[in-house]
Design a protein with these regions (language model features):
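Acceptor-binding helix/loop patch of EC 2.4 sugar-transfer enzymes
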Residues: 39, 105-151, 219, 294, ...
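A short, active-site helix/loop in glycosyltransferases that binds the activated sugar's phosphate group
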Residues: 114-115, 145-187, 231
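Conserved donor-binding/catalytic core segment of Leloir-type glycosyltransferases
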Residues: 188-224, 230
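Short hydrophobic beta-strand element within catalytic cores of glycosyltransferases
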Residues: 288-297
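A charged, aromatic-enriched C-terminal amphipathic alpha-helix characteristic of glycosyltransferases
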Residues: 328-362
Length: 369
């Protein structure tokens, strides 16, 4: 079988493509390298600055199009698959839908139905747009709510892609829940894929201060809640300077980021949405992830035995107490580290995820005889 992925986020599609190749299939990932993040893609198509950059970008896609026909599945990363205005994106989407067997729209980040599910349906205890019943009113939430809910061309393209895609895929609990809320018959869940390295050396009792790591994308500080998390960590570090070591990585390339995180005891990730690739990377390295890990996320994976993540509440005092517990009792980290590795290998191993993804073909053929 032949798979084409257009657009990626945090190497999720690239890792899935690797799994599909190892299972004997063809897979191609086209997208950007994510500026400073330097993500992996098979074909890099990035838009340069100004009018010249836009023209070159358009020509590059036009030259690629004849080669992007005859795939069994074309998988689009929501509306982030190209850096064009919605009208032109629709033309490319419709062309690829016409000249390939099936198209899937995968939600890997923000999108109309995700924002709609958070803002209007209020599906979650916390999200990028709410904390309980209270709307978040920061600049990011206001701007994104307006863009995804009130811009006619964005809404129109979102509806068109959702209604004409053969399947919709959510890669995390919130993404799946929002798509399923609006399109229950055609929504599927496929976990994020993760390569699992050899058994890390730091599994076992924590020796010395607890090493806590946080990665920050400055332009997404408010969105992810890392502004609040950093404030809590600084307070914790001031209170227990001899019991913990605090490491911060800000806007560094992916490979360097992983090197900086290696050897940590705890990763403090994000505050409003469920765990994603960042937490999985850490867990695969034997690092305990402190993030949002609600019961519904485990249930979607059919996980009933292992719950290794530290579930962060959306309030500063609750976050402080959760992390303080492990700073004062580092001996309790060893089992959580072992469970973290086992959880990723059981639920997110890239070959197993690739097999789950391949199983979508059966549903596609059943729904489209």
């Amino acid at each position: 079988m032949k798979f084409l992925f257009i657009g990626d986020a945090s190497n999720a599609r690239y890792t899935l493509a690797k799994g599909l190749r190892e299972l004997g299939h063809e897979a191609l990932v086209i997208g950007t390298r994510g500026k400073w993040r330097r993500m992996n893609v098979d074909i890099c198509v990035e838009r340069g600055a100004g009018r010249v950059g836009a023209v070159v970008y358009l020509l590059r896609w036009l030259l690629l199009l004849p080669k992007l026909r005859g795939y069994d599945i074309v998988d689009f990363n929501g509306q982030f698959f190209m850096d064009f205005k919605p009208g032109l994106k629709r033309l490319f989407f419709d062309y690829l839908r016409k000249h390939n067997r099936y198209v899937i729209s995968t939600l890997l980040g923000l999108g109309h139905y995700y924002v709609k599910g958070c803002v209007e349906a209020k599906l979650f205890r916390s999200s990028d747009f709410n904390i309980g019943d209270t709307p978040r009113t920061n600049a990011f939430a206001s701007q994104m709510a307006d863009e995804w809910l009130n811009q006619p061309e964005v809404v129109k393209l979102s509806r068109h892609m959702a209604e004409t895609s053969h399947l919709l895929v959510g890669t995390g609990y919130e993404y799946w829940a929002c798509l399923h809320h609006y399109f229950p018959e055609k929504t599927c869940f496929v976990p994020l894929p993760m390569e699992t390295p050899e058994e890390p050396a730091n599994i076992g009792e924590t020796q010395g201060p607890v090493r806590i790591f946080i990665g920050i994308q400055k332009e997404r500080d408010e969105e992810k809640g890392t502004d609040i998390l950093w404030r809590v960590l600084q307070r914790l570090n001031n209170d227990y300077p001899d019991k913990m070591t605090l490491v911060r990585a800000e806007n560094v390339p992916y490979d360097e980021y992983c090197r900086m995180m290696a050897g940590s005891d705890i990763l403090v990730d994000q505050l409003y949405t469920c765990y994603a690739m960042n937490a999985l990377i850490a867990m695969s390295m034997g690092i305990v992830a402190a993030t949002v890990a609600i019961p519904e996320a485990y249930a979607l994976l059919s996980e009933k035995e292992s719950f290794p993540m530290i579930d962060l509440p959306p309030d500063e005092e609750g976050i402080y107490r959760q992390l303080e517990h492990y700073v004062l009792h580092p001996e309790r980290l060893a089992e959580a580290k072992r469970q973290s590795i086992a959880f990723v290998r059981k639920r997110h191993h890239y070959l197993e995820v690739a097999r789950q993804y391949m199983s979508l073909m059966g549903r596609l053929e059943k729904n489209n005889p």
